[in-house]
From Swiss-Prot:
Cell compartments where the protein resides: Cytoplasm
Domain of life: Bacteria
Catalytic activity reported: 2-(N(omega)-L-arginino)succinate = fumarate + L-arginine
PANTHER family in the record: ARGININOSUCCINATE LYASE
Swiss-Prot/TrEMBL GO biological process terms: arginine biosynthetic process via ornithine; L-arginine biosynthetic process
Keywords from the named record: Amino-acid biosynthesis, Arginine biosynthesis, Cytoplasm, Lyase
One Gene Ontology molecular-function label: argininosuccinate lyase activity
Broadest EC class assigned to this enzyme: lyase
Pathway this chain belongs to: Amino-acid biosynthesis; L-arginine biosynthesis; L-arginine from L-ornithine and carbamoyl phosphate: step 3/3
EC number: 4.3.2.1
InterPro entries: Arg_succ_lyase_C, Argininosuccinate_lyase, Fumarase/histidase_N, Fumarate_lyase_CS, Fumarate_lyase_fam, Fumarate_lyase_N, L-Aspartase-like
Protein name: Argininosuccinate lyase
Gene that specifies this protein: argH
Length: 457
């Protein structure tokens, strides 16, 4: 079709320039929402008396026909983008009246509207997938409230904890992600439609009507801002980066735990791969892929922040670069959440190996220090005493539970027989009953709270 902007020009763009400027290869993803936006715009034009009834009926029928044949459409780079491609297809169906659809509308507010609509659909789908992941985490946690494992700092064994407590830490990370996405929807559910190229329009349009038809909750009060704003995209990319960071941290732990050196978890065959050379291998490839894809999602955020950092108002062609990054991020984070959900749901935690790991370390050292405090010794002094006891064990090739009472009393005479039950890792975990702690009762309370959060939806 003739370029929408062709009247000003005396020669066509070169084929190379045309291909370089075209976005149809990726923005065709917006086809369905573009038609949705056009239907709302056309209905508003009719209700405002800008379109005749017969014109509205023709345009509506044509757009709905395009909706039913969406998968069959053939797009061309000659028509640059999804908007011009769909206008060409509509013109082929209903004739010149299709040109009236663009009354009081620019591609600037049109593409912004499309992006708002598309992102709303995606964010809702991502929220649903995150909730499913959280549900799976609570199911695994429920089975492992009293499964004891080493807790780590600096990847060194620190204190014994409940496996459920560890799993639920990620539940709350994803809960914050869900909160951020829900808040992001407030900015996504704003309508730029009717802002025109930048300055509004002389036609008596009703922007609130078209917003209502599209399910938007607000209308941009400034037309310049409406077509220039991509904050909602940047905000989403930042949230998606945080989701991927949380997934990547969890994946890192799974990769470590699945190694023979730890052997804390067994991933199902459905979420593992082998080696083309080494027949014994069972690799956590999908956890590694999620960890690796996190970097690309970060790159999309930084890339688009850099694109937007020096753009004057209003629209600039640079902003065409918003789509590939956000589409790639959306696909990546959604797939990652869904793959990770299946991986966790089908994983088997090796409870005996986890418990055994707590029996052969010094993660009960804090229990000994706390015991001394209950005997009236200041914590800093108790810390020093226990440090010397640990050093003695390291030099002697034993653990705190192996020391005799007479040996303990060389470090301090207040230590008595009642110390030994406290050194048991299961008892050590059970006793940590403070709110949010790893004690079994506290973890059950936390699990109930997590389930309550999911029931709110």
């Amino acid at each position: 079709m003739t370029k929408l902007w062709g009247g000003r020009f005396t020669e066509s763009a070169s084929a190379q320039a045309e291909a370089f400027g075209a976005s149809i290869s990726f923005d065709q993803k917006l086809a369905a929402v573009d038609l949705q936006g056009s239907l709302a715009h056309a209905q508003m034009l009719y209700e405002q008396g800008i379109l005749e009834k017969t014109e509205w009926e023709q345009i509506e029928a044509g757009l709905k026909q395009l909706q039913t044949t969406l998968e069959q459409h053939v797009y061309t780079t000659v028509d640059e983008d999804i908007h011009m491609n769909l206008e060409r297809l509509l013109t082929e169906q209903i004739g010149p009246v299709a040109g009236k659809l663009h009354t009081a509308r620019s591609r600037n507010d049109q593409v912004a509207t499309d992006l708002h609509l598309w992102m709303e659909q995606h964010v809702l789908e991502l929220l649903s997938s995150l909730r499913n992941l959280q549900s799976v985490i609570t199911e695994q946690a429920e089975q492992h409230v009293e499964t004891v494992m080493p807790g780590y700092t600096h990847l060194q064994r620190a204190q014994p904890i409940s496996l459920a407590h560890h799993l639920l830490a990620y539940f709350w990370m994803f809960e914050r992600d869900a909160d951020r996405l829900t808040d992001n929807l407030k900015r996504i559910r704003m309508s730029p439609l009717g802002a025109g190229a930048l300055a509004g329009t002389t036609f008596p349009i009703d922007r609130f009507k078209s917003a209502e038809l599209l399910g938007f909750e607000q209308v941009y009060p400034n037309s310049l801002d409406a077509v220039s704003d991509r904050d909602f995209v940047i905000e989403y990319l930042g949230i998606a980066s945080t989701v991927m960071m949380h997934l990547s941290r969890f994946c890192e732990e799974i990769i470590i735990w699945a190694s023979q050196e730890f052997s804390f978890i067994e991933l199902s065959d459905a979420f593992s791969t082998g080696s083309s050379m080494m027949p014994q291998k069972k690799n956590p490839d999908f956890a590694e892929l999620i960890r690796g894809k996190t970097g690309r999602v970060y790159g999309n955020l930084m890339g688009f922040l850099t694109t937007m950092k020096a753009l004057p108002l209003a629209y600039n062609k640079d902003m065409q670069e918003d789509k590939e990054g956000v589409f790639d991020t959306a696909d990546t984070v959604l797939q990652s959440v869904q793959i990770f959900t299946g991986m966790i749901e089908s994983a088997t935690f090796k409870t005996e190996a986890l418990k055994k790991a707590t029996m052969q370390d010094f993660s009960n050292a804090t229990e000994l220090a706390d015991y001394l405090v209950t005997k009236g010794i200041p914590f800093r002094e108790a810390h020093e005493i226990v440090g010397k006891a640990v050093l003695h064990c390291v030099q002697s090739g034993c653990f705190l539970k192996d020391l005799t009472l007479s040996t303990y009393q060389t470090f301090h005479p207040v230590i008595a027989e009642d110390v030994y039950p406290l050194l048991d890792p299961v008892q050590a975990v059970a006793r940590r009953g403070s709110y949010g702690g790893t004690g079994f009762t506290a973890v059950r309370d936390q699990l109930a709270l997590a389930k309550k959060q999911l029931e709110k939806l």
